[in-house]
UniProtKB/Swiss-Prot annotation:
Catalytic activity line of the entry: NAD(+) + (deoxyribonucleotide)n-3'-hydroxyl + 5'-phospho-(deoxyribonucleotide)m = (deoxyribonucleotide)n+m + AMP + beta-nicotinamide D-nucleotide
Record protein name field: DNA ligase 1
Keyword terms of this UniProt record: DNA damage, DNA repair, DNA replication, Ligase, Magnesium, Manganese, Metal-binding, NAD, Zinc
Functional note: DNA ligase that catalyzes the formation of phosphodiester linkages between 5'-phosphoryl and 3'-hydroxyl groups in double-stranded DNA using NAD as a coenzyme and as the energy source for the reaction. It is essential for DNA replication and repair of damaged DNA.
Pfam annotation, one family: HHH_2
BRCT domain span: 599-680
Sites where the protein binds NAD(+): D35, A36, E37, Y38, D39, S84, L85, D115, R138, E175, K295, K319
Positions bound to Zn(2+): C413, C416, C431, C436
Gene: ligA1
SUPFAM superfamilies, sorted: BRCT domain, DNA ligase/mRNA capping enzyme, catalytic domain, Nucleic acid-binding proteins, RuvA domain 2-like
InterPro entries noted in UniProt: BRCT_dom (IPR001357), BRCT_dom_sf (IPR036420), DisA/LigA_HHH (IPR041663), DNA_ligase (IPR001679), DNA_ligase_CS (IPR033136), DNAligase_adenylation (IPR013839), DNAligase_N (IPR013840), Hlx-hairpin-Hlx_DNA-bd_motif (IPR003583)
Domain of life: Bacteria
Stored NCBIfam families: dnlj, PRK07956.1
Length: 680
């Protein structure tokens, strides 16, 4: 007899963990685990939900594509859902996919359109009467981010379709990529001017398309490669193609580039031969790929097979195994994270893996070093797990010379010298000194990161400088900084310093309770749990007073999480931090986990505002967040009901329209002065 409560708890944990990794991968471009590790978790959840249907949840990652839409860009619904793909990692799994089609269709399709599985950013470009009108990222599949202005700068994207029989409306799906050679040149330019150096072409492509400043996007070597369509509206009402291979030919006629090496395969065996051929040649291709996508070629068969909640039943991604190369393990250094965990990091002789130079790889914990039998000076095999995260696979014992040395895990913290503690129920070694400089530094970095308050302009580099200089010892100290304070640090000129301070102020006045809970970095408390807590407690005072039993009655909170929350609030240093944050004005009081709280005494309370033009002190999204935090309602269209319009530089037709209606117009400085009233 199965233990349903136990399986229910496991399924809930898997859903939360998969959702967290989806956000890290799709939204933040900072994956923590490999594709293979993600797929192991995903398949476990699929198996649980299949064996016990009562565990099914419509919000489960198995029922959706993955990746919520970021707040910085406008959201828009897809006309037709943009699905993800199911994966296969072996010939047996490819055979099982074919067998499922045999069991579904009376006549089994034998032809498949195959092309490389590109490692870029999936999105949709939309054309009305042959003219490019808009672009959306895949987002969560149902809605995406509007990136029209950015995509207009992509040089190989046709702004007007060529050829004949152009549809009235055409939605083209594809991938934005950066070629390997272009990526190397981009990173060289970035490094030369002290800019961000990207980890891989996918991160560079995703970050470039999501830029609010399209002049930056225009300077990036982006390509759009089309692989399919969404909605198509034609004169005759019926598409003039009956196969996917015909569709690809039509897309090329209209002016789209397509993935390299695409071809029609006339049997499942030919598909597998193509997969093996492309796997052997992947290094010679101009773009990064991580597998092959095989699609049933016949469009009637595609319609008959249909879709699951997550993916088409007529297409499959055949993933390549991770590429492995040899290099030397030069050293192992131990880093201390914000929760005090000591993490060993392999220092490697630099080597190229899958087009990316790798010189470091996490070893996770002491047991991984022991289990793999690693010694300092070893020649090792290295791969990028899931073609993303560097990983030491194993030592090449046969190459040992006798000069290799064992690594001894430290018994004291490498940062503060405190004795290292290892709980019996954990694999991690921890520094439990709350005053440890590394713990403080990493906690502040997390506080302002995208996973915390998301303060633009306060990256790891500037936080490191502030902590090292003694200007900041806790997160609350950030809110005492001035523009002049920041201008003394590297990469902080007058404009960037002013923008960073404005971002801090926006975070202080606009943070939700849920966002602040995330920023505090309470162990085991992620975004979903933070939203749960913010829904059930009116503020941090109420949360602090809740005992373990009360916490256990909340959804998503088990004994381990409840104990971690109590441990955080029982720590005197944390209580002092909360009081300092309260004194700085960062104390959301509304139990709304999804929207900003409204501060009392605001001059903007109840007003309807519109922003137009380019703002200098902050981004448009930050201004919107600050206005809403002050109780205003921000809209995007000009109307007589507007109370005020905030006009930045180069304001255009909306400003003209507002003036013709006699609306009250203010500039960015006046808007900032209205916000200052919040602190009086």
């Amino acid at each position: 007899m199965c233990n349903i409560p136990q399986h229910q708890s496991r399924a809930a944990w898997l859903r939360a963990e998969l959702a967290r990794h989806n956000r890290l991968y799709y939204e933040l471009d900072t994956p923590e685990i490999s594709d293979a590790e993600y797929d192991t978790l995903y398949r476990e959840l699929v198996n649980l939900e299949t064996l016990w249907p009562a565990l099914m949840d419509e919000a489960s990652p198995t029922q959706r594509v993955g990746g919520e839409v970021l707040d910085r860009l406008e959201k828009q619904a897809h006309t037709m859902r943009m699905y993800s793909l199911d994966n296969a990692f072996s010939r047996d799994e490819w055979g099982a996919f074919i067998q499922r089609m045999y069991n579904t269709l009376p006549e089994t399709p034998s032809s498949f359109w195959c092309d490389p599985k590109m490692d870029g950013l999936a999105l949709e470009v939309i054309y009305e009467n042959g003219v490019f009108t808009s672009a959306l990222t895949r987002g969560n599949g149902a809605e995406g981010e509007v990136v029209t202005a950015a995509m207009r700068t992509v040089r190989n994207l046709p702004l007007r379709l060529r050829g004949n029989n152009v549809p009235h409306r055409l939605e083209v799906r594809g991938e934005v990529v950066i070629a390997k050679a272009d990526f190397e040149q981009l990173n060289a330019r970035q490094s030369a001017v002290g800019g961000k150096v990207f980890a891989n072409p996918r991160n560079a492509a995703a970050g470039s398309v999501r830029q609010l400043d399209t002049s930056i996007t225009a300077g990036r070597p982006l390509q759009f490669l089309a692989y399919g369509v969404g909605q198509v509206v034609l004169d005759g009402g019926t598409a003039p193609w009956t196969t996917h291979s015909d569709l690809m030919a039509r897309l090329r006629e209209w002016g789209f580039d397509s993935p390299p090496e695409g071809r029609l395969c006339t049997s499942p065996d030919e598909v597998w031969a193509y997969y093996e051929m492309l796997g052997a040649r992947r290094e010679s291709l101009a773009i990064e790929i991580d597998g092959v996508v095989a699609k049933v070629d016949d469009t009637e068969a595609q319609e008959a097979l249909g879709f699951t909640a997550r993916a088409p039943r007529w297409a499959l991604a055949l993933k390549f195994p991770a590429m492995q190369v040899r290099t030397r393990l030069q050293d192992i250094r131990v880093q201390v994270g914000r929760t005090g965990v000591l993490t060993p990091v392999a220092i490697l002789e630099p080597v190229r893996v899958g087009g990316v130079e790798v010189s470091r790889a996490t070893l996770h914990n002491a047991y991984e070093i022991e289990d793999k039998g690693l010694m300092l000076g070893d020649m090792v095999l290295v791969q990028r797990a899931g073609d993303v995260i560097p990983e030491v696979v194993r030592p090449l014992v046969e190459d040992r010379t006798g000069g290799e040395r064992p690594f001894v895990f430290p018994t004291t913290c490498p940062e503060c010298g405190s004795v290292v503690h290892k709980p019996n129920d954990e694999v991690a070694h921890r520094c439990i000194n709350v005053s440890c400089p590394a713990v403080r530094r990493q906690s502040i970095i997390h506080f302002v990161s995208k996973a915390g308050l998301d303060v633009r302009g306060f990256g790891e580099h500037i936080v490191q400088q502030l902590v090292d200089a003694g200007r900041v010892t806790t997160a609350a100290d950030l809110f005492s900084l001035t523009t002049v304070d920041l201008m003394g640090f590297e990469r902080m000129g007058p404009t960037s310093a002013a923008n960073a301070i404005a971002s801090l102020d926006a975070a202080r006045t606009g943070a939700t309770l849920a966002r602040l809970i995330c920023a505090l970095g309470i162990r085991h408390v992620g975004e979903q749990t933070a939203r749960t807590l913010a829904t059930h407690f009116v503020d941090l005072d109420a949360m602090r007073k809740a005992d373990g039993e009360k916490l256990l009655h909340l959804p998503d909170i088990g004994p381990e999480v409840a104990a971690s929350i109590r441990c955080f609030f029982d720590n005197q240093s944390n209580i002092e931090l909360l009081e300092q944050l309260r004194d700085k004005g960062l104390w959301p009081r509304k139990p709304d986990a999804n929207g900003p709280f409204v501060r009392e005494g605001s001059q903007l309370q109840g007003l309807k505002l519109l922003f137009t033009g380019s703002l200098q002190r902050m981004s448009r999204s930050e201004a919107k967040r600050m206005a809403e935090a002050a109780g205003a309602h921000v809209v995007s269209n000009v109307s007589k009901s507007l109370d005020m319009i905030v006009a930045g530089a180069d304001a255009g037709s909306k400003l003209d329209q507002a003036k013709s209606l006699g609306l009250h117009v203010i500039d960015e400085d006046a808007f900032a002065n209205l916000l200052k009233g919040l602190d009086r």
